[in-house]
A protein has these predicted regions:
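Core structural elements
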Residues: 1-2, 44-62, 156, 297-308, ...
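Acidic/polar, glycine-rich intrinsically disordered N-terminal extensions of enzymes
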Residues: 1-69, 215-219, 525, 529, ...
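Flexible, glycine/charged-enriched surface loops at secondary-structure junctions
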Residues: 33-42, 101-104, 144-151, 229-232, ...
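Active-site cavity-forming subdomains of large catalytic enzyme subunits
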Residues: 70-287, 311-315, 364, 368-371
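A structural-propensity feature for long, helix-poor, extended segments
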Residues: 111-150, 277-310, 366, 374, ...
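Internal maturation/activation junctions in enzymes
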Residues: 201-204, 294-317, 321, 342-419, ...
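Catalytic alpha/beta core of large soluble enzyme barrels
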Residues: 249, 255-258, 302-307, 389-393, ...
Length: 543
């Protein structure tokens, strides 16, 4: 088992999954005055995989090893000088050594060919330093058996953006990175109005080109190579509840957590598939009282994780404890829809998404308000500024009134992670917001000795349906997989969920290979119009 605690010699200390869950519950209850009471509450939330903390928490909590319980970090801004660049590289290496993935914004580095004062040379540009980061990542294994992940972003107005867009088209280059372009509102307006776009650095314009030409380069790279992703950075900052005290320039490797410099990504997911009562019947539903209680416990567990976790860097600890940001999300979402008899992407699915996520949003914010009353608000809480910032004014009136009177423990509370590995751990429920990729498939598993083994796996809802209805009963119309859905089906679900998520969503929009380029470009424009914070697509091709 991936998350089993083992001795240095490889002998299992966790003998069973309940042992692992008990270890995690015990560790996360340590900050409580009545730790035994909360240990039992936390363990109950973890049983049957109802609440799934992120992998770093499951594997590291209670082991006393020098690892972080935060999955990912956005690192500090890279100074535009050699000593600062390699200090940033050192910080990245130390973070990855403890098991954290990292995000970096390379827009702060001067473009290739710019003069370097005092040395009589020209700058090699940000892409050359990304190669150095890539080499570093190749040599560092994260804690346990988890390889490091990295996200590199660059602003759409950086002079080297065209090279950035095409960087991974070179065989073998930057394979340890995910790449995304930070797209501004001004750029989207320039694309719409077909005006010129300046590429500049430090107030110097290096090139001007039609905005649509640059947009087409981004789109064609995605059409053929599935990268770079698009992040609507102005929308992210505009809707950030902390925009009164921070500016976001990057995201964690999967994109669900836009973060400020040294920001940390603490994740956990409610497994909706485990909460459906009377599955595959007309009475199928989620018990909203049970969901609310589970969310309340999960928020407390994640908040405690901030206090028990180690941090690779002091700056990361300071940032996390000053803002107490958490990212509570969902997994098993598509399975829950199937069990409720609802087709992913349908209007009924959109309505159910909003109903479930509104319940989760309310429960999470109320839990954090109650924690603030008990333990205090996050240190950088400014009542007037917080209540008027970002997405906070859109919350229900009773929540706003409660925050005004009692404060709030956590600055941000919700995020939708991809949850690939923990979903497999939880009996192969569907991942995050994603539709079921395939109801039965072969998974290639790398073993501890480096060998690979093929395993036949089936989706959770599919196996449950077969157990309840029999092997020969036809599947219902709700059994749709990613390949049978249109891009619009994906988009409406992402947009519906984003309304109730204060951070962001990791989501891939699967496209048919036959999709026309014009229709492909429309996906991104539609995502922007629907209020999404980012857009990532995958179109299968021979590359």
């Amino acid at each position: 088992m991936k998350y089993r605690f083992k001795s240095e010699g490889g002998t299992p200390i966790d003998q069973t999954i309940p042992d692992t869950l008990c270890r995690v519950a015990t560790a996360l209850a340590e900050p409580e005055q009545d730790s035994e009471f909360w240990k039992e509450k936390f363990y109950k939330a973890l049983t049957d995989f109802c609440f799934l903390p992120a992998g770093r928490i499951i594997s590291g909590a209670g082991t006393e090893r020098n690892v972080t319980l935060f999955n990912c970090f956005v690192m500090g801004n890279i100074p535009d000088d050699m000593s600062g660049i390699f200090l940033a590289l050192k910080e990245a290496a130390l973070t990855m050594q403890q098991g954290g993935g990292i995000g970096y914004n390379f827009s702060t580095l001067r473009p290739k060919g710019s003069p370097v004062n005092g040395v009589g040379a020209d700058a090699s540009g940000p892409l050359s330093f990304m190669d150095v980061w890539d080499s570093m990542c190749r040599t560092i294994m994260s804690a346990g058996s988890r390889r490091g992940a990295m996200m590199a972003v660059m602003r759409c107005d950086h002079p080297d953006i065209e090279g950035f867009i095409e960087a991974k088209q070179e065989p073998g280059r930057l394979r340890m990175f995910n790449l995304s372009v930070l797209v501004t509102d001004d750029f989207m307006t320039a694309v719409k109005e077909d005006t010129a776009w300046n590429l500049s650095f430090d107030k110097t314009v290096y090139k001007s080109l039609p905005a649509r030409e640059l947009w087409d380069k981004i789109m064609r790279a995605n059409y053929a190579f599935a990268e770079p992703g698009v992040i609507f950075i102005d929308r992210i900052n505009r809707l950030n509840p902390l925009n009164y005290c921070e500016t976001i320039h990057g995201t964690n490797p999967c994109g669900e957590q836009p973060l400020p410099p040294y920001g940390a990504c603490l994740l956990g997911s409610i497994n909706l598939a485990r909460l459906i009562k009377n599955p595959f019947s007309e009475k199928a539903r989620i018990d909203e009282k049970e969901l609310t209680l589970l969310v309340t416990t999960a928020v407390r567990m994640l908040d405690n994780t901030i206090d028990v976790s180690q941090f690779p860097l002091a700056a990361q600890q300071k940032e996390a404890q000053a803002k107490r940001r958490i990212g509570l999300g969902v997994t098993g979402f598509a399975d829950a829809l199937i069990m409720a008899g609802v087709r992913y992407g349908s209007s009924q699915a959109v309505n159910l998404t909003e109903q479930w996520m509104h319940t989760i949003q309310r429960a999470a914010y109320w839990a954090s308000i109650e924690l603030a009353e008990e333990k205090g608000s996050f240190p950088l809480f400014n009542r007037e500024a917080y209540l008027s910032s970002g997405c906070i004014p859109n919350l229900d009136d009773d929540i706003l009134t409660a925050i005004k009177g009692k404060g709030i423990r956590n600055s941000l509370l919700t995020s939708i992670a991809p949850t690939g590995t923990i979903s497999l751990f939880a009996d192969n429920v569907s991942s995050g917001l994603e539709p079921v990729f395939s109801f039965t498939y072969t998974r290639h598993v790398t073993m501890p000795d480096g060998t690979r083994r093929d395993e036949q796996v089936s989706d959770y809802s599919y196996l449950l349906y077969r157990r309840l209805k029999g092997e020969n009963t036809p599947l219902t119309s709700a059994f749709v997989d990613a390949q049978s859905l249109s891009p619009k089906d994906h988009l409406v679900m992402q947009a519906a969920m984003q309304k109730y998520i204060d951070s962001s969503i990791s989501k891939t929009i699967n496209c048919p290979e036959s999709i026309q380029f014009k229709d492909f470009k429309d996906i991104y424009v539609t995502a922007y119009g629907l209020g999404c914070k980012s857009c990532t697509t995958y179109r299968p091709n021979a590359v």
